[in-house]
Amino acid sequence: MDLSCGTLLVNMHETSSGLLYDMSLLSDFCRERGMALIVDAVSAFIAEEIDMAALGADVVLTGSQKALACHPGISIMALSPRGQERVAENPEVCSYLSLKEALRNGERGQTPWTPAVNTLLEINARLRSIEARGIDAERAEIASRAKAVRDALTSTTLEMVPENPSNAVTALRCPASNAKAIIERAKTGYGMWLCPNGGALCDEVFRIGHIGAITEEDNDRLIDCLTSLSAEGLF
């Protein structure tokens, strides 16, 4: 295996399978080899603990539409001091995608190009809300929602796909290969929208999200729906 590369880009949480990767292991791997670490945390942000300094992460990426529960349209990038140094050392190859330009404008509290302004205001309000409440409380609520759903399914035939699932989503395997029927019945019979999987696993796996603007009452309704689907013999 050629390990002469200088950067590792990793998806912290795999949304199609629900798997949460071992970031400590990947962090150690990069440190031992002097590699930069870029973390795609689009669906892991807020749902999982992400300490850039502890991980030695140079870049962390996320988006507005997942756990932030804002409208889509804005990508968010956090750079460590070392990450900013690497940006400064590299030549600009595209004006519209220039991180140098973004950092220069950030010093004056601006973006280089007009952003999705409404979404930016939403993000500002959401982050202030999280700051006031505390990130630990926010993360604990997501984890609690995930645990409640998973506990409710322990006596059914559904199987968890990953051994190390993220708080953000629960991916479930259907032994009867009737994922589409489960999704359709949940939607038409109970007004609950479950997430299908694509490709070869479209009949075998479906997913349940735990991030976003989900209330305790929403989660209780979801659990009632799943309990009813099980009683109907769908799993």
Predicted regions and their residues:
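PLP-dependent enzyme catalytic core of the Aspartate aminotransferase-like
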Residues: 200, 204-235
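Active-site phosphate-binding strand-loop segment of PLP-dependent enzymes
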Residues: 1-46
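Conserved PLP-binding catalytic core of the aspartate aminotransferase-like
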Residues: 159-189
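A short linear hydrophobic-aromatic micro-motif
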Residues: 157-160, 192-197
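Active-site C-terminal subdomain of aminotransferase-like
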Residues: 65-148
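Conserved active-site segment immediately N-terminal to the catalytic lysine
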Residues: 53-65
